[in-house]
């Protein structure tokens, strides 16, 4: 449910303006996460591409419902985007990639009124526990920061 928020935060961190950015959403199959992200992003991302089997149906719906500029790509087509967002085990394309399904992306969450518990516990783990115990709703939690994985040639341990 937070995929669009994570993508927007990553775009902001990379300096990609939604009204000019070309964003590709890539997945090996249709999923609720892909559809929810596409619906949410189509509201403000100017150029949105879907690279998923049967993506034509979703693209058509978004064009009709939202008037969004959404087009589809075949999975073997070269993806020319400012940022490619890969869900699940989609093969990583060339260029800048946000691999949501790989676990390589680090996301920090925030919520209000954690009190003294935030000084004792890891804040992200505390927020997850509050959400799991129904003490916080999803709309009370926001994405604070997104750290992209290092490039292949970078050492993740260096500052």
Regions inferred by a protein language model and the residue ranges of each:
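Generic hydrophobic, helix-prone segments enriched in Leu/Val/Ile
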Residues: 7, 78-79, 130-131
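A glycine-rich, Thr/Ser-enriched phosphate-binding loop motif common to dinucleotide/cofactor-binding enzymes
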Residues: 1-9
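Glutamate identity and glutamate-enriched acidic tracts
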Residues: 5, 19, 35, 40, ...
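Glycine-rich phosphate/diphosphate-binding loop of Rossmann-like nucleotide-binding domains
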Residues: 13-77
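Rossmann-like adenosine-cofactor binding region
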Residues: 66-121
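Adenosine-phosphate binding glycine-rich loop
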Residues: 99-159
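Proline-rich intrinsically disordered, low-complexity coils
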Residues: 18, 28, 53, 91-93, ...
